[in-house]
Curated annotation (Swiss-Prot):
Its EC number is 4.6.1.17. Transmembrane segments: none annotated. The keyword Cell membrane does not apply. This is Cyclic pyranopterin monophosphate synthase. Keywords: Lyase, Molybdenum cofactor biosynthesis. It catalyses: (8S)-3',8-cyclo-7,8-dihydroguanosine 5'-triphosphate = cyclic pyranopterin phosphate + diphosphate.
Amino acid sequence: MTEFTHINQQGHAKMVDVSDKQITKRTAVAHSSITVNETIFKQISNNTNTKGNVLNTAQIAGIMAAKNTSTLIPMCHPLPLTGIDVHFSWDETNAPLYTLNIQTTVSTTGKTGVEMEALTAASATALTIYDMTKAVDKGMIIGETYLESKSGGKSGDFQRQSNQ
């Protein structure tokens, strides 16, 4: 029978004890995206949105989300993060729809990984862009959010293959 790591002997939720794990450098990279119309693309690119600089605000939201992941995900350990970066790149190949790709990188030196922090950062970044531009068009599409890679820890490294 499989033993669940987040359930105690009484069948109730618990946070995994990581006190015996080795301290290692851990990094995770996550991806999300948001597809917008041409008006929103131009507003973001030209920094003319009435709510302010969309990308700067979304970057800050992503950083804050990574730092606060343990308050959102019940069994996630609070971690001393050593680095958080949010990077944007436009895909203009399907104009008049434009996809903003979001890549987040989170690092720590600790006993557990930062995959959830990277995924939370990517999600919050996309949600913030939606929030700041929804007055223009509510039809935006937040795309797939997934882990691109992780390094460090007992389970080793992971690199998403293009066919995954």
